[in-house]
Structure formats: C-alpha cells, structure tokens
Amino acid sequence: MDLIETVNACVGLQKRVLKLAPNTNLNTAGQSVLNDYNALASRVNGRTYALLDQTAVYTPYTVNAPIISLAVRISTDDYDDMRSGIDSILDILAAAIRTEGSRPTRVIERRVIEPNVKQLVEDLKLKSLTSEISIANMAAVDTALIQPEIIETENPLFADIIEQVIHRPNASMTGGNIRATLGRWSGNKGIVTCMSGMDSEHRFTVDFKTRTCGIINVVYAPTAGVIMIPMPTGRNREGHLIDVSAEMMAENFAIDFMDDDDIIQTETGVGVFSFPMCNRIRFRINPWDMQKHNDNLWTVNLANWPQGTSPRQPAISFLFETRRTFTEGDYQHLSRCAPKVQYMMDTIFPETAFTNRPVVDWNVQSLLTSSSQKTWCQKIAMLIAAYAAKI
C-alpha cells in the first residue's frame, strides 16, 4: 500500500537524520541526508491537510519542515530544525494513518482512496517498500512484491491440550493399570505429566503452526502428588504419583522432529537441542518398565506395580520451551516487534482515534488473526506497524 511505503521511507529518513550530530562536519553520507531532507521539505513545507487527530476529529495539520542551508558543518539550530521538521511530517503521517484506517475495506489495496491522504502521499513523493518491523511488510508479501520474510516467532505452537488415557479392565482407584498423559501447551511453552500405571510407552505429538526451525529446551519438573485422571468411560479417578525422574535414562525419553510423517532428527534425554525445519514434534517417553522394576529400583509404594495394585504410580513431569525459532512470517505469528506495535496502538492510535473501526479487541494479535472484517483489520495493523518503526 502506498501509504505504508511512504511511512517506511519517512521513518527511514528520520533514522538517518538522528544519526547525524550538530556542530559536526558532514561526510558524504551526511550531505546525502541533508539533500534528501531538503528535497522532501521543499515539497510539503507549509502545506495543510485536514486529517483525524487522536480524538477522531478532523483537524488541519500544517507541515513545518524548514529548508536547511547546505554547509559542510551543520549548526545546532539547523539540526534542531531538521529534526523537528521530520517529526512534523511523521505527526501528519500518524494522522493520515488514523484517517485511512477509519475507512473500511474488503480487498487488498495498492493505493489509498481517502482524498486528503492521497494528496499527502502524492506531495511527499517518497516511498520505501520494506520496514524494519515485519508486520508492516505483509502488505508487500500479499501483493507478491517481496517474498515472505524469515522472522523469529514468539508463538510457533498451536494452543492445544492432551488427555490421553489408556487403561486395562482391572484399573485401580489410585491409577494402577492406567497410562495417562496429561498436559497443555501454547505460544512457545508446554508442560506434560506422564503417569505409568502399567508397562507402556507414552507417545504424543505437538504441532507447529508451520514449518519451523530453532532450539528447544526440555527439563524435568516436580510431579504433582495427586492428579485427576479423566477416564474415557465412567467416573474420573485419582492418580497417586511418585516422581521417578531420578531414575530416568536418556533412552527413556526420546524426541522425534518430524516433517509430516517423516522423522528428520531424533534426540534422546532432556536438555537443549537445535532442531531442523519441521512441522511437528513427537515425544516418546517410558517413565517406568519391568526392567527397572527387576533391577530393584522400586520403592515400597511401587512393590506391587506389575500387578497394578501399588498405592502410588511412577510418573514424570517435564517442561518444554521452544527458543529462537524462525519461520516464514505470516499473520499467525507474533515476532519480537509486536509489543512495540501494541505500544503505538495504546498511545498514538487508540481505538477512539478512529471514526470507524472493526469490531475486534484492540490489540495486535486480534487485528492480525481476525476472521471478521479481515482485510480491514490487517490494513490497520500494518499501517500502525510501519509507523512503530520510528525512533
């Protein structure tokens, strides 16, 4: 969208201006910044545009961007004028975002329609296709101007829950002859408890939103004393647990990194692992088996475990966390820049600053993932994200 591209370019110029310093000789790059600023200021200085302010009222905004005299050395006054000039332009662009964002849209647009905003974009005549904030680049991706950006995602996992319970007919009231895998995960973390009331392997998968690579950290956590077991049929039962993580060996805990049904890489034990591009993780866990029992690793409460009548059942709990995960950016993923966009939404672009707004919660994630008024929501998020890249 041309308004996003204009914001990108003006934000880029602001950063170049702020890299300069007053009372300092300008090198070639500094002279280029001065020339680019003067070219922009000469086109819009003194012009007035009626745009929405932060109270959603049309207000005349006048650009105050003085032209700076060319010199080898920039004075303090000239530097302050240049800095305030680019800030004045950015303030008007913020008003343009509020104005254009208030106009509902149903399809992806390459050009703004709002007359006052369109005039501002034509007067500035400065555009840049990409932003430092990945959310703002999604408009260029949607129109096939650039390839999807590789981003570090903060929420690679689908939110999900596992309640996997297998039991024999003679299951006891304390969890004997029951294999239960209970847990949940969302964002980039999950915690799971595996209770082995019988000799059987726990096996379950955790799905990524899309093909992802990165680092995963897995660590044992203290197991609860008693858990509720949601039985497939009949009343729920209690699982009385004993933490056996002290006797867990590497071969008792395996992690398969899978691309659909193909195993790409397998790691054993807990720890920190780098994993290749995959779209699901499969855990294979065996907290307790007959071999451990025959090796006399059991305690008094596990003496009758093979018969399923022991008062407590062997169990482990573990926490897993994906870290530094990278994937192709899309609307499902939140990158590290999302909180900065949210800050701008809460300060410069509150929902009360728009004369019309989609019926969604006013936060970045809701705008990006809304299925209602989808294109309009995404347009607002991308416009604000482009502005959020400013210093």
Swiss-Prot record:
Native species: Rotavirus B (isolate RVB/Rat/United States/IDIR/1984/G1P[X])
Phylogenetic classification of the source organism: Viruses, Riboviria, Orthornavirae, Duplornaviricota, Resentoviricetes
InterPro entries (alphabetical): Rotavirus_A/C_VP6
Keyword field contains Transmembrane helix: no
Cellular compartments annotated: Virion
The keyword Cytoplasm is annotated on this UniProt entry: no
Domain of life: Viruses
Alphabetically ordered keywords of this record: Capsid protein, Intermediate capsid protein, Virion
Oligomer and partners: Homotrimer. Interacts with the inner capsid protein VP2. Interacts with the outer capsid glycoprotein VP7.
GO biological process, any: fusion of virus membrane with host plasma membrane
Family of the protein in this entry: Belongs to the rotavirus VP6 family.
UniProt main location, coarse: virion
Role of this protein: Intermediate capsid protein that self assembles to form an icosahedral capsid with a T=13 symmetry, which consists of 230 trimers of VP6, with channels at each of its five-fold vertices. This capsid constitutes the middle concentric layer of the viral mature particle. The innermost VP2 capsid and the intermediate VP6 capsid remain intact following cell entry to protect the dsRNA from degradation and to prevent unfavorable antiviral responses in the host cell during all the replication cycle of the virus.
GO cellular component, one term: viral intermediate capsid
Name the record gives this protein: Intermediate capsid protein VP6
Alphabetized GO MF terms: host cell surface receptor binding; structural molecule activity
